[in-house]
Amino acid sequence: MLYPLTFQPIFKERIWGGRNLERLYAKPLPAEVPIGESWEITDRPEGVSAIANGSLADKDLRWLMENHAQDLLGTGRENTERFPLLVKILDARATLSVQVHPPSTVARQLGGEPKTEMWFIADAAPGAEIFVGLKRGVTRAGFERHLKSSTVAECLHRVPVQAGDAMFLPSGRLHAIGGGLVIFEIQQNSDTTYRVFDWNRVGLDGKPRDLHVEPALASINFDDAEPRLISSIYSRNPVLSVRYLVDDPLFRVDGCKVKRGQRFHLRSDALQIIGLLKGRLKISHEAAEVELTPGQFCLLPACLGRVTLLAEMHIEFLQVQTS
């Protein structure tokens, strides 16, 4: 019954957002609104993805989880209450707040949810940077002093980035996205975020945005000093070149490149998600067929087994698998 699935994006207005999702990926953004997030695959109270293709186009991801969890996720994974991942594209016209997601132990104490995630830089303005972790030697006491004097930026580890760079962000890692970046974000299905510093600016309502200083301080890993970008090395293969990005108990992400005209196959007993970065890709399984353009995602249910892909142009894509 299931087949390769695409979904309608859900757009989120953010004060730091822009219009790059329209420019780069022809997303149908609402007019004159700063859109910071496109939720591409989501099963949350704040937004559930509606299926966009095929015979199930009147259903959504929540319906799939309630009625076809085993086919979707794979045997042994069907008892998951919610879909395990949240997939977004972020457009940061301006720098985001300095924030942290709580580790599982802290999340339980505070009533939130842990969130581990990874960023893949899809587009970057000259001089763009991300803030990840702390400078070496920064202590909690020193960090709190900088908070009081609004000089937190002096504590943050800055990393210059360009398109193609990637960063892993386990729960507890302090971070902020700099302005001028478009990012494909793969994350644990959670939306608990504690803002600790917001660059002394105001929100869409003209008032300073709420900060969550105490929960943030309890969540930050103060031993997390100067983390590095993920390796940019691809394997050498005449058909499918692979770059191993993340191999975590929550999810695995690989970056893949395929030359124009190559036909290849993917097989897994767990669900997979394909996110196209460049080119044009055709995905087929039995009679079902999906064509992806950059900025689109396709969910491959676990029950499909082998799926055929055709690179209609030179393609680059992310392959996401649940563990």
Predicted regions and their residues:
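Short beta-strand/loop turn elements enriched in aromatics
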Residues: 121-143, 242-246, 258-270
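Double-stranded beta-helix
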Residues: 131-154, 183-225, 313-323
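Acidic/His-leaning functional-site neighborhoods
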Residues: 230-296, 304
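Ligand-binding loop in jelly-roll beta-barrel domains
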Residues: 80-82, 90-95, 114, 124-127, ...
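His/acidic/aromatic-lined binding-pocket segments of jelly-roll/cupin-type domains
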Residues: 87-88, 96, 117-120, 158-159, ...
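Short acidic-glycine-tyrosine-enriched beta hairpin
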Residues: 156-168, 182, 286-304
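Short, structured patches in soluble enzyme cores that scaffold and shape functional sites
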Residues: 100-102, 122-125, 134-136, 147, ...
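Transition-metal
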Residues: 1-138, 198-231, 253
